């Protein structure tokens, strides 16, 4: 009997589950917000908490432990330089899981998992993208007007000749 045996199996063998969780943790640290299923979000929560706690220690040994778990050096740098200082005075509870509904294909429950305090950063990224998109649309509109003016000038020039 497996009474009170903890952990999430997620329908995978040990190596696959470990790789999945490492990838999810790395993605969350880099992106600060990801969408996944609720069981995966719940399974990765303790791993992210441990990584942030390592980041708060800030010594070489902690950096090496984090580098051994995380998939990219970019994630390690962001963990130690950006994320951990944000939670300097907080003892745990660094994440928020927000349920977003069910997946149409198989009915799996989806959720966003995000670092607390990342709302401002995500909003800044969204505003920056919107500004870039608006600038690109304006440039395209000006280029189209210039093309239309040039085509109109060519057609009026042909009728005079």
Curated annotation (Swiss-Prot):
The keyword Ribonucleoprotein is annotated on this UniProt entry: yes
Q: Where is the composition biased (Basic and acidic residues)?
A: 132-144
- Tell me which InterPro entries the record gives: Ribosomal_bL17 (IPR000456), Ribosomal_bL17_CS (IPR047859), Ribosomal_bL17_sf (IPR036373)
Comp. bias regions, Low complexity: 145-161
The record's annotation in PROSITE patterns points to:
RIBOSOMAL_L17
Q: Which GO terms describe its cellular component?
A: cytosolic large ribosomal subunit
Region annotation (Disordered) ranges: 132-161
Q: Name one GO molecular function term.
A: structural constituent of ribosome
For biological process, the GO terms are: translation
Keyword Zinc in record? no
UniProt xrefs under Pfam families: Ribosomal_L17
- So where does this one cross the membrane? none
Q: Which UniProt keywords apply?
A: Ribonucleoprotein, Ribosomal protein
Tell me, how does this one assemble? Part of the 50S ribosomal subunit. Contacts protein L32.
Q: Which HAMAP family match?
A: Ribosomal_bL17
Tell me the protein family, please: Belongs to the bacterial ribosomal protein bL17 family.
Protein name, as recorded = Large ribosomal subunit protein bL17
| Organism in which the protein naturally occurs | Koribacter versatilis (strain Ellin345)
Q: What is the lineage of its organism?
A: Bacteria, Pseudomonadati, Acidobacteriota, Terriglobia, Terriglobales
Task: List the gene name.
Answer: rplQ
């Amino acid at each position: 009997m497996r009474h009170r045996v903890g952990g999430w199996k997620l329908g995978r063998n040990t190596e696959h589950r470990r790789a999945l969780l490492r990838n999810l943790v790395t993605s969350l640290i880099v992106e600060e917000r990801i969408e996944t299923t609720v069981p995966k979000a719940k399974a990765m929560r303790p791993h992210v908490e441990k990584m942030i706690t390592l980041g708060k220690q800030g010594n070489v040994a902690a950096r090496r432990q984090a580098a051994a778990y995380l998939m990219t050096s970019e994630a390690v740098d962001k963990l130690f330089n950006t994320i951990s200082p944000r939670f300097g005075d907080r003892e745990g509870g660094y994440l928020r899981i927000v349920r977003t509904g069910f997946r149409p294909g198989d009915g799996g429950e989806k959720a966003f998992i995000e670092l607390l305090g990342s709302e401002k950063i995500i909003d800044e990224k969204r505003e920056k993208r919107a500004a870039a998109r608006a600038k690109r649309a304006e440039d395209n509109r000006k280029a189209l007007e210039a093309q239309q003016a040039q085509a109109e000038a060519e057609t009026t020039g042909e009728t005079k000749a």
